[in-house]
From Swiss-Prot:
Chief location category: cytoplasm
Biased composition (Polar residues): 489-506
GO cellular component, one term: cytosol
The protein, known as: Rab GTPase-activating protein 1
Organism expressing this protein natively: Pongo abelii (Sumatran orangutan)
Location of the region described as Disordered in the Swiss-Prot/TrEMBL record: 1-79, 482-527
Modified residues (Phosphothreonine): 996
Bias (Acidic residues): 510-520
Listed Low complexity bias regions: 7-22
Organismal lineage: Eukaryota, Metazoa, Chordata, Craniata, Vertebrata
Residue span, PID domain: 142-298
Domain remarks: The arginine and glutamine fingers are critical for the GTPase-activating mechanism, they pull out Rab's 'switch 2' glutamine and insert in Rab's active site.
Annotated keywords: Cell cycle, Coiled coil, Cytoplasm, Cytoskeleton, GTPase activation, Phosphoprotein
Gene designation per UniProt: RABGAP1
C-alpha cells in the first residue's frame, strides 16, 4: 500500500524496526519514499496529527481510494481456491447478532505457508438475536463478518507496534484531533488467510485492505475513558520498515468487543484447503530455499565405557555439563524441504566458547565418524571433545547457579550439488557442574535443534566447467534464530478489558494441527506436555507434599481430589513414587544394578519392541540413543527379576512413561510396584485368564451404562478383546497422546487398576454416536485410527478424564461380575467333553515342551558359541602375553647394555675432566711466569729510555755552557763561527771528532745489548704462545670427544675453559 493512502501521520522515532518477531509474517524491507521524522518529545504538541488535505473529507476519501492502485503482492499469486465456509461462534450479549449470507464466494488464498498467530479466547455458542435489534448486525461477505456504522479516525506511524501504551496514546490523539471523520464499513474474515477490508457504506466499494497475517496487534480503549468506544489495530506497511496503527470508533460501545472477537476468530481459524491447491500452486521464489534441521547433542563419559547424552534444562534451555569429563559432540543434519541434496562429507567440526565468535576463534575437534543414520533420513557427524584443553577452559570451570555460558558449534559440510562448502553454526547455552554431581533428570529432550534456510542459485550451463560440475552456488544461509533476532514483534495478540480500567494480553493459541483423515494411526509418544502450572495449584501441592513427607505411610485426605485434576508435570516424578510406595526402595535400586548385568532370555523381543516404543518422542526416536538404551535396561532388568512372567509385549510403553519422569532405578522400582502391588502382572498369568475376566467385566459394564452400544457390538460380532486388549495390557500408554496418558497413570497410581474401566467406558461413551454407525471393519479401524486422534486436543482429553472420574463404578459391582465370570467358566469346563479338555491341555503342554526344548537348544548353541569365543579370546590373550614377554626380555637386555655404556662414558668423562684440570693449571702457571718476565723487560726498557733522555739533556746543557764560555773568551772566539762550529783548526776538529766517535760507539754498544735482550724476550714470548696453541689444540680434541658423547654439561665446561684461556692469551699478547 502506498504511503499516500494513510489518513494521517504522527512523527515518531526514526528507529523503526525492520522485521517482525514471528514466523507468521513476511520480511519487511525498507522503501525510502518517506522517512518518519525524529520525535524527541512525548507530548501531544510534538506528536500532532497531520491530516492529508487539511481535513477535507473529499480529499481524505480521494487519498484512501489510492490504496486500490497498489500493485499486487508477490507472495499472493493470482490463483483462487474455494474456501470452506465456517460459521462465526460468538457470544450473543448486547444488541448484536450474527447473520451469514447463503451465497458462497471464492477467496484468494495465499500460498505462503504460515503458522497461525497464538491467541486464547473463549468461544461459546452464540444465541441469535433478531436482525433488527442493532444497526451493527454482521453480514457475511466473502467468508467474513461485516460491521457497519463505524467511523475511521485515521492512521499514524508507530515505532512499537505491540506496545499497548503507544497504541492507546495514538488512539487518544487521533480521537481528540480528528475534526472530520470518515464513515466506513469493516469486513473481518473468519479465517487467518483472509483480508480485512474497509468499504464505503454507500457504494459498498473497497477503500483499503489489510491481510490478516500483516495485522500485528489489536487493542480497545479502557473503560471509563473517552476512548472506550474505540478500537485499533497495527499492521506492517507493505514494502517499508513502517508500522501503522488504524483507529476506529463505534457508535455503540458494546460493538467493540464483538469486533475484537471477530479478529480473534480470524487469528485462530484456518481455511480448509481443497486438493486443487496442491496441484495449482505455481513456482514461488522459495523454490530456491532449502531448509535443513540441524540438531546438536553433547555426550559425556559415564565412567562405564559409554558416552551418555547430557541432560538439558528446559527452564533455561541449556545443557548441563560436568567439569573435566571427556565429551563427544554429535550433529544431526536433516533436509526437510525442497529437492534432496546429497551431503558428500564433513571436513570440519569446530567448537568455541562464547557467542558471535569469529572464525579465527573456532577450534577444530577430532572427527570420529560421519555418515548417514540407520534410517537414512539424517547425516550424523561425531567428534571428540577434550574439555581440559586450554582453549576450552571457560566451559570447563564450574558455573555459578545464577549464570549460564554460551558455546558455539560449527560443522562444515561438502554438498555434492553446491559449489562451495556450507557451514551450519549453532549457539547454545551450557552450565558446568561439579564432576561428582549426579545429573538425573527425566528430560524428554536432550538435544537442541535449529532450522537453517539455505538459498541457492542455479548456475547456468555455460558457466559450468563440465556437465558433472556443481549445479548451485550459495546466495545466503540464515538460521531461524537469526530471523527471529531481526524481527521486532511477537505473534499477534488481542487485548481485552478486564475489571476496571486494567487490560490484559491474551495470546492466541496455535492453530489445531489437524491432519486430514487417513488410515495412518497416531504415533505413540505424540503430544507435548507443558510444565506450566498455576501458582495457586503449585502452592496447594507444595503444602500437601510437605504434610505427606511427615508420614509417608498415610496419604493426605485431599490427595484424591487433587490427583483427579491431574498432577502438575513438574511434580509427577516425585508424586508417582510416593503413590506407588517407593519412598523406601533402596533394595530395588541395588537389585536393579545387579539385574542389568545379567542376560535375559527375551532379549530379542525386548530389542524388537524398543524400536517401536514412542517413535514420535524425541527421547526415544533415535536408534541406539540414550532413551532406547535406558528403556532396554529397564525391560531387561524386569524380565530377569520376574522369572514367572518375564517380559511381555507392551511393557516397554509403561516403562517409557515412567522413564520420562524419573531416573532408571526409580522407574524400575515404580514398574515393579505397578506390576506386583497393583496387579498388572496378574493379567499376563494363566494364559491371560484374568485379562479375559476384565473383558467380561467391561462388557457387563457396557451392558449397564451403554446398552445400545453393547447391543450394536453384539450385532456386528465385535468382542471386547478385539479393541480393549491394548488398553488393559499397556494402560492406554501405547496410542494416546502423552498428556492423556500421564493423567491416566496419575489416577491409576492413586485409585488402583480399576480406573481402566472408568477410562474405557468414557472412551466408549464419548465415541458412541460414531461407533453406532460402523460395521465390524469400520469399528476396528475407528479404535485403531480415529479414536486416538480425537484426543490430540488437550481440551478433549480433559473432558474425557472428567467424565471418567465422574463415573461411579463400585468395587462390589466388579467383584460381582468377576464371580459371574468364574461361575460361567466353571460351567463351561463342566459342560466340556473331558477328552477335548485333556487333548487341549495336552496340546498346550506339548507346545510348552517344544518351546522349552527350543529354548534349551538356543541356550546350548549360545553356550557352545560362547565357549568357542572364549577359547579364541584366550588363545589371542596367550599369544599376546608371549609377545609381551619377549618384548620385556629384549627391553631388559637393552637396559643392561645402556647402563654399561653409561658407566663407561662416566669413567671417560672423569678422566677427561682430570686431564683438563691438570693442563689448565700448567697453562695458568706458565702464563703467570711469562707475564712476570714481560713486565720485568718492560720496566728495564723504560729505565734505559729515561737514562738516555737524562744524558742527552745533560750533554746539551754542558755544550751550551762551553759555547757561552768560548764566546766570552776573545782568543777562543776566533776558532768558532756563529753556529758554534770550529772554523779551521783541523787538529782541534779531529780531537773533537774522536771524542764524539768514542761516545757514539759506547752508546751503540749499549743499544745493541738492549736489542739483544729484547730479541731474547720476544723469543720466549713466541715459545709461550706456541705452548698455549698446543694446549688449545688438546682442548679442541677433548671438546670433540665430549660432543660425540653428547654430554652437554661437559661441553659447557670446556667452552668456559676455552673462553678463559683465549681471553688470557689475548691479554698476554
Amino acid at each position: 500500500m502506498d504511503d499516500k493512502a494513510s489518513v494521517g501521520k504522527i512523527s515518531v522515532s526514526s528507529d523503526s524496526v525492520s522485521t517482525l518477531n514471528s514466523e507468521d509474517f513476511v520480511l519487511v524491507s525498507r522503501q525510502g519514499d518517506e522517512t518518519p521524522s525524529t520525535n524527541n518529545g512525548s507530548d501531544d504538541e510534538k506528536t500532532g496529527l497531520k491530516i492529508v488535505g487539511n481535513g477535507s473529507e473529499q480529499q481524505l476519501q480521494k487519498e484512501l481510494a489510492d490504496v486500490l492502485m497498489d500493485p499486487p503482492m508477490d507472495d499472493q499469486p493470482g490463483e483462487k481456491e474455494l474456501v470452506k465456509r465456517s460459521q462465526l461462534d460468538g457470544e450473543g450479549d448486547g444488541p448484536l447478532s450474527n447473520q451469514l449470507s447463503a451465497s458462497s464466494t471464492i477467496n484468494p488464498v495465499p500460498l505462503v505457508g504460515l503458522q497461525k498467530p497464538e491467541m486464547s479466547l473463549p468461544v461459546k455458542p452464540g444465541q441469535g438475536d433478531s436482525e433488527a435489534s442493532s444497526p451493527f448486525t454482521p453480514v457475511a461477505d466473502e467468508d467474513s463478518v461485516v460491521f457497519s456504522k463505524l467511523t475511521y479516525l485515521g492512521c499514524a506511524s508507530v515505532n512499537a507496534p505491540r506496545s499497548e501504551v503507544e497504541a492507546l496514546r495514538m488512539m487518544s490523539i487521533l480521537r481528540s484531533q480528528c475534526q472530520i471523520s470518515l464513515d466506513v464499513t469493516l469486513s473481518v474474515p473468519n479465517v487467518s488467510e483472509g483480508i480485512v477490508r474497509l468499504l464505503d457504506p454507500q457504494t459498498n466499494t473497497e477503500i483499503a485492505n489489510y491481510p490478516i497475517y500483516k495485522i500485528l496487534f489489536c487493542v480497545r480503549g479502557h473503560d471509563g475513558t473517552p476512548e472506550s468506544d474505540c478500537f485499533a489495530f497495527t499492521e506492517s506497511h507493505y514494502n517499508a520498515e513502517l508500522f501503522r496503527i488504524h483507529v476506529f470508533r463505534c457508535e455503540i460501545q458494546e460493538a467493540v468487543s464483538r469486533i475484537l472477537y471477530s479478529f480473534a476468530t480470524a487469528f485462530r481459524r484456518s481455511a480448509k484447503q481443497t486438493p486443487l491447491s496442491a496441484t495449482a500452486a505455481p513456482q514461488t521464489p522459495d523454490s530456491d530455499i532449502f531448509t535443513f534441521s540441524v540438531s546438536l547433542e553433547i555426550k559425556e563419559d559415564d565412567g562405564k565405557g559409554y558416552f551418555s547424552a547430557v541432560p538439558k534444562d528446559k527452564d533455561r534451555q541449556c545443557f548441563k555439563l560436568r567439569q573435566g569429563i571427556d565429551k563427544k559432540i554429535v550433529i544431526y543434519v536433516q533436509q526437510t524441504t525442497n529437492k534432496e541434496l546429497a551431503i558428500e562429507r564433513c571436513f570440519g567440526l569446530l567448537l568455541s566458547p562464547g557467542k558471535d565468535v569469529r572464525n579465527s576463534d573456532m577450534h577444530l575437534l577430532d572427527l570420529e565418524s560421519m555418515g548417514k543414520s540407520s534410517d537414512g533420513k539424517s547425516y550424523v557427524i561425531t567428534g571428540s571433545w577434550n574439555p581440559k584443553s586450554p582453549h576450552f577452559q571457560v566451559v570447563n570451570e564450574e558455573t555459578p547457579k545464577d549464570k549460564v555460558l554460551f558455546m558455539t558449534t560449527a560443522v562444515d559440510l561438502v554438498i555434492t550439488e553446491v559449489q562451495e562448502p556450507v557451514r551450519f553454526l549453532l549457539e547454545t547455552k551450557v552450565r558446568v557442574c561439579s564432576p561428582n554431581e549426579r545429573l538425573f533428570w527425566p528430560f524428554s529432550k536432550r538435544s537442541t535443534t535449529e532450522n537453517f534456510f539455505l538459498k541457492l542459485k542455479q548456475i547456468k550451463q555455460k558457466e559450468r566447467k563440465n556437465n558433472t560440475d556443481t549445479l548451485y552456488e550459495v546466495v545466503c544461509l540464515e538460521s531461524e534464530s537469526e530471523r527471529e533476532r531481526r524481527k521486532t514483534t511477537a505473534s499477534p495478540s488481542v487485548r481485552l478489558p478486564q475489571s476496571g480500567s486494567q487490560s490484559s494480553v491474551i495470546p492466541s493459541p496455535p492453530e489445531d494441527d489437524e491432519e486430514e483423515d487417513n488410515d495412518e494411526p497416531l504415533l505413540s509418544g505424540s503430544g507435548d506436555v507443558s510444565k506450566e502450572c498455576a501458582e495457586k495449584i503449585l502452592e496447594t501441592w507444595g503444602e500437601l507434599l510437605s504434610k505427606w513427607h511427615l508420614n509417608l505411610n498415610v496419604r493426605p485426605k485431599q490427595l484424591s481430589s487433587l490427583v483427579r485434576n491431574g498432577v502438575p508435570e513438574a511434580l509427577r516424578g516425585e508424586v508417582w513414587q510416593l503413590l506407588a510406595g517407593c519412598h523406601n526402595n533402596d533394595h530395588l535400586v541395588e537389585k536393579y544394578r545387579i539385574l542389568i548385568t545379567k542376560e535375559s532370555p527375551q532379549d530379542s523381543a525386548i530389542t524388537r519392541d524398543i524400536n517401536r516404543t514412542f517413535p514420535a518422542h524425541d527421547y526415544f526416536k533415535d536408534t541406539g540413543g540414550d532413551g532406547q538404551d535406558s528403556l532396554y535396561k529397564i525391560c531387561k532388568a524386569y524380565s530377569v527379576y520376574d522369572e514367572e512372567i518375564g517380559y511381555c509385549q507392551g511393557q516397554s510403553f509403561l516403562a517409557a512413561v515412567l522413564l520420562l519422569h524419573m531416573p532408571e532405578e526409580q522407574a524400575f522400582s515404580v514398574l515393579v510396584k505397578i506390576m506386583f502391588d497393583y496387579g498388572l502382572r496378574e493379567l499376563f498369568k494363566q494364559n491371560f485368564e484374568d485379562l479375559h475376566c476384565k473383558f467380561y467385566q467391561l462388557e457387563r459394564l457396557m451392558q449397564e451404562y451403554i446398552p445400545d452400544l453393547y447391543n450394536h457390538f453384539l450385532d456386528i460380532s465385535l468382542e471386547a478383546h478385539m479393541y480393549a486388549s491394548q488398553w488393559f495390557l499397556t494402560l492406554f500408554t501405547a496410542k494416546f497422546p502423552l498428556y492423556m496418558v500421564f493423567h491416566i497413570i496419575d489416577l491409576l497410581l492413586c485409585e488402583g487398576i480399576s480406573v481402566i474401566f472408568n477410562v474405557a467406558l468414557g472412551l466408549l461413551k464419548t465415541s458412541k454416536d460414531d461407533l453406532l454407525l460402523t460395521d465390524f471393519e469400520g469399528a476396528l479401524k475407528f479404535f485403531r485410527v480415529q479414536l486416538p486422534k480425537r484426543y490430540r486436543s488437550e481440551e478433549n482429553a480433559k473432558k474425557l478424564m472428567e467424565l471418567a472420574c465422574n463415573m461411579k463404578i463400585s468395587q462390589k459391582k466388579l467383584k460381582k461380575y468377576e464371580k459371574e465370570y468364574h461361575t460361567m467358566r466353571e460351567q463351561q469346563a463342566q459342560q466340556e467333553d473331558p477328552i477335548e479338555r485333556f487333548e487341549r491341555e495336552n496340546r498346550r503342554l506339548q507346545e510348552a515342551n517344544m518351546r522349552l526344548e527350543q529354548e534349551n537348544d538356543d541356550l546350548a548353541h549360545e553356550l557352545v558359541t560362547s565357549k568357542i569365543a572364549l577359547r579364541k579370546d584366550l588363545d589371542n590373550a596367550e599369544e599376546k602375553a608371549d609377545a609381551l614377554n619377549k618384548e620385556l626380555l629384549m627391553t631388559k637386555q637393552k637396559l643392561i647394555d645402556a647402563e654399561e655404556e653409561k658407566r663407561r662414558l662416566e669413567e671417560e668423562s672423569a678422566q677427561l675432566k682430570e686431564m683438563c684440570r691438570r693442563e689448565l693449571d700448567k697453562a695458568e702457571s706458565e702464563i703467570k711466569k711469562n707475564s712476570s718476565i714481560i713486565g720485568d723487560y718492560k720496566q728495564i726498557c723504560s729505565q734505559l729510555s729515561e737514562r738516555l733522555e737524562k744524558q742527552q739533556t745533560a750533554n746539551k746543557v754542558e755544550i751550551e755552557k762551553i759555547r757561552q764560555k768560548v764566546d766570552d773568551c776573545e782568543r777562543c772566539r776566533e776558532f768558532f763561527n756563529k753556529e758554534g762550529r770550529v772554523k779551521g783548526i783541523s787538529s782541534t776538529k779531529e780531537v773533537l771528532d774522536e771524542d764524539t766517535d768514542e761516545e757514539k760507539e759506547t752508546l751503540k754498544n749499549q743499544l745493541r745489548e738492549m736489542e739483544l735482550e729484547l730479541a731474547q724476550t720476544k723469543l720466549q714470548l713466541v715459545e709461550a704462545e706456541c705452548k698455549i696453541q698446543d694446549l688449545e689444540h688438546h682442548l679442541g680434541l677433548a671438546l670433540n670427544e665430549v660432543q660425540a658423547a653428547k654430554k652437554t654439561w661437559f661441553n659447557r665446561t670446556l667452552s668456559s675453559i676455552k673462553t678463559a684461556t683465549g681471553v688470557q692469551g689475548k691479554e698476554t699478547c
